[in-house]
Amino acid sequence: MSFRIYSLHLSWSRKDKIIVNRDCHQSVINTLILGDIEPAYIYPQIDNKTNILMGIKIEDAIDTIDKNLDAKAILLTYPTYYGKVYDLKTICNYAHSKGMMVIVDEAHGAHLGLSDKLPMTALEQGADIVVQSTHKTLPSFTQSS
C-alpha cells in the first residue's frame, strides 16, 4: 500500500472531503474511491503549445478552498510530473488559515533539498505530510519507492 493511501486512510472518515489536483497519481483516485472520500478537484493549467500540464494556478487553488471550506485537507502534486513548480507556500498558508491539512506528493522532487539553487521542498513551504520517492529523481532502485 502506498503512503498516499495509508496517510489518507489514517486521517479521514468515509464521506469526508479533500481537495485534490486533478492530475494526481492514480493511487490517490483509488484511495478516494476505496475510502469513500469526496474529492473537490483543482484543474491544472495546460500549455497550449506542448499540451504539458503546468501545475495549478494559485487563484484556482484559493478559489477551490473557498468553495470547499468543509474539506479536511488539500493534496497536491509538487513538482508536477513534468518538473513544473508553483507557489506552494501561498497555498499552504491559505489552506492552514482555513483549518486544512496540506499533503504533498513530492515523488518527482526528492532532489529539491540537495541544493539551494533548486526550488524549496514542500516541507520548507509548509506542507504537513510529504510523500517522496527517490527512484524517480535520485539514484535508487525502483523498489525503493
Name each model feature, range by range.
Residues 1-145:
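Conserved PLP-enzyme active-site core in the AAT-like
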